[in-house]
Amino acid sequence: MGIAESTPDELPSDAEEQLRSGEQQLELSGRRLRRLPGAVCALGRLQKLYVSGTGLRELPEEIEELRELRILALDFNKLERLPDGLCRLPRLTRLYLGGNRLLALPADFAQLQSLRCLWLEGNFLRRFPRPLLRLVALQSLQLGDNRLRALPAELPRMTGLRGLWLYGNRFEEFPPALLRMGRLHILDLDRNRLGGFPDLHPLRALRVFSYDHNPVTGPPRVADTVFLVGEGAVERMAERDEPTPRPRARRPAPPFEDEEEEDLLIGGGGAGTLGRPGVSLRALEAAPGLGT
């Protein structure tokens, strides 16, 4: 029995088989589903829930009953708002909300203090969601393909952030707050409206910087250990790698703290993807020490 043949509160038969296998994981992706079956919220021991590309329009407040949930994939649906109940999942570490219709996040979103990976690409966000500023454990933040024009001055409060994707937004100037994000490993500003860059040497941990498809005439000033993607990047990296009569020892960029951090930044662990397709993903694969 497929999901389209089930009542809104029933689990499809194959989903029940998934649970009987002993794995605390439920895969509902790709089914026709306007709302989450009520029976799902009764699965109090569930740890991973995938509901991607179903046409989902709403979530029940009862989703807060999934107290053991670690991974929740809701990308490529039709969600316009999130219930407060979603903000009360104490163990949630990875949340995928890309490709929906979100204009904002609930104020209680800041309660997701275990969250380490958040993907919000392809929504309708015009302002940086301020509840995110309180998520100090967040490591990977995907905000590509939204409508952002500025970043809050308080952004450096997010001391755990290591990867920040801002491609496909509406930035006309390099956001000053980014210069105080000294722990960032990956920064993607591809496809914006940037006409130039400040000196990026203050970003001491930076390993990959993508600025392609902006109206700039050349690469920014960065440390020699940074892998660049954009106009003039290949030439710049070739120049700095040429041997000199008195070569200086180059200190390698700080490595990832552990394999889990690398997985969060490069793979994301979400719904079978490695990240957004395109030049920046290729850059990550090519960058020394960053390939998967």
Where are these regions (language model features)?
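The feature captures the LRR N-terminal capping module
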Residues: 1-144, 150-153, 163, 176, ...
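Conserved active-site motif detector
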Residues: 181
